[in-house]
């Protein structure tokens, strides 16, 4: 059992980090705690108040929304309704029950509603039910209709004021513009054109002079000149402005905004008021007010969400000063891609916006009911309709682009999914419109968003991952920690800085050498300034220092050893492929790790963690009972062979024994892809880098048969099959063993209900659940009527609609769930019974499967060789895997070579002899000068084992059982050909590398079809494995046959094998009767083309070679006659789409 092995790693890290890795799920859990105002949030608020910090919002999300909407007044203001004190009842079902029964894990939300009659002063108070509110599980996910989902955080442009510079190509002048962007409401834009006039656009409408807006706000010409007279641009603008008074200006604005409507002073004044000065219509939000105050150096209170006259005047002043060439240190344009100008909408805020939307819809209903109902009879309950609120929350979780089906391939995939940052989604960017600048790596991403981990393809750069140490502040800006440096001495004080604050400081990197007293060891320190510029400066000018070398990368990237030796493109692939790794039968932690494995596994939430210290009292495969020190007991239930969202296997197993002492926070059971509490995504395999008979050309891989025999790379996959019995127009469907026209042996594994027994081996086409559906009643013959009279209903027509194992799938039945209306289960309307069957299959590794390392070195297995044919070492050990060395140099992922060498060192163990070389001193200093064989090592990113250390350790490895050191400082060994026993002419790089088996398995991709469904319109076979489609013989394939002159093969492919409906049946008939295959007819798609042209009023006729018109009939009697003889039902409509299949 794995528990016997220690999971401690020998680390090659030289830097002592002052800060622990924070809770990796805090991005999700803290945001949701704030939304619902949970106890955990209240504790954080209290702690922040006690220590004088303001980094925790003191009003919960739901409270904010209810405060915003209260009071709802009727149109006359005589009555109002307000909400306060929301609370949650305990959830009705547990997370596990919700997953089992396809329900949403939620808790009932209650709010105290107060109805006030303002004329009489009477107050009626009631507790109102506001619907079931989905709750977050402790793992940061939501269970919606039985499936786990994740809400991804969204990266959006922050509300605020932004200044831009652009070059006018004609006049070669710098033009300046500015946008005031609110959280909700109309945009206000200022711009200076090439004629030096200052213009304004209100709500994206036509441009007008900025002086018109100032006059509309009540300024006269004298006041404008007094404030802006020094700027030529404003004087020119004023000269060209023909409005004389405030009234003229207001009417002028009204005409531009509402062309065609008769303007009056009152309506114009109201319009302007509503656009920018009405809190109901315009809101900068707290973050917008913070950004505006900061940019324009104002001191307006944070709760003022509307624009003030001061805001507008200062913005105009800023633009004209920029245009006049003011001091760049004080006045500068903004970079929209800077992380000071992009903020995160986390889960809490996204759901809060949705609740706000629902309450706004409800508000309209309440107002209408206030006017229609009798004042005396009104109670809060009669006014409120919770439908819009419930619907908007449901809509968000069910259909929003940001609520996603959780990636559960392995624990790392889930963890990364929860830490994902997306610029897409409502209110964000779209793939098509996003340019290169938005997608690019920006200096302000440092320590906030990982520069490596992002998808390949159309979403590159739009979807990122939160860096390891980053956190989100109350405004939604991402902060990263730095160590404070005072007078050239590094302190233990940690400050979290936003990208804006960071720009004002000078930062040293984490690996800057320090003296024991915390001062810089060298007299010149390499630092980073604003915009990513680097230079050497004296130590006393440094403000901050990085807390850790892995501060800039995400969790997945921080799990790549020797990341510093890999090209970024390959590291990106490595980060992404770790998330596609399949949980294997027996997990094995990497020999060469980075020290991040244990933390990632624990925070991913797929292991069982002990809550309170105590002693293990009782345990089995299903549960662990711990007796706590205070005498209480707690039983931890383990998940056994559950199906994940991706069909991989979730299985937990204990790693402690009865009587063991366990501490709070200790891992007591491993989950999928974990080994002794560490993330274990693959296997350590003995690798040789050499070409082998051309079989590993172009990234192909050669494997040893041992990996198949010993189930080294075998994984379990579980498929769920579902069938329901519904009420149809002709009567109810029935789940039964009594299926018409089916042999008894087919039903051998079904029980008396018609459901397959657990443990049965099934293959494609086997019946899992027997089901019959009533057939349409036809006119009965007298004989049939007689039979009915004698035998009663028994002779009624039913057809077999049983659930069968799909093509290409097989395995063993491991579970059956039956839900029926009779037993009181909640089922959709019209469904009487629902049966789910779980089929598990063990997939051994096979040729065609995709394997990968952690450095983006991926390939497909081309050949599995018998163990005796594999190249072997001097002591007879055959290698497990042969990789092509050509895959390394041009891809520049040298990390895999260093991992190979260090893997060998870790596997064989080492003993460094006495000596004064630098590397020996360093290893002694960190306690890494000796180890036993099979010791796991950690080489953290940017702070790992150095090249000379690895060279030295290869020389210091322990000898094998024959006293021979197989590999020296070169890292290469003499290998022998397994087939001939001859040594290969050159030494070969051999060592241990961590190999992952990816979810791209050949069994899921391989597919073949004889006959199957055809498309309704073109009558051609459908495409794709899911539709049981055919292989497309495309344009280029046709050219190939044309080039060879294979005319008959081509004609056959384009007609009878595809869409010549008549010919298809005739060929079938000819084959059955043993006759020659007839001449092909006209393909259906040709007929469709003719019809389309005719629909465009083009008279198209088809003529034969001798000029006679060819008649194209839609049906052919001969076909139907032939089909009937052969028992083919041509009247049955083939499915025309994926849904129907």
Swiss-Prot record:
SUPFAM superfamilies assigned: beta and beta-prime subunits of DNA dependent RNA-polymerase
Catalytic activity: RNA(n) + a ribonucleoside 5'-triphosphate = RNA(n+1) + diphosphate
Record bears the keyword Repressor: no
Enzyme Commission number, as recorded: 2.7.7.6
Any one GO MF annotation of this record: DNA-directed RNA polymerase activity
GO cellular component, one term: DNA-directed RNA polymerase complex
Transferase recorded as keyword: yes
Alphabetical list of NCBIfam families matching this protein: PRK00405.1 (NF001616), rpoB (TIGR02013)
Subunit composition and interactions: The RNAP catalytic core consists of 2 alpha, 1 beta, 1 beta' and 1 omega subunit. When a sigma factor is associated with the core the holoenzyme is formed, which can initiate transcription.
Protein name according to UniProt: DNA-directed RNA polymerase subunit beta
Gene designation: rpoB
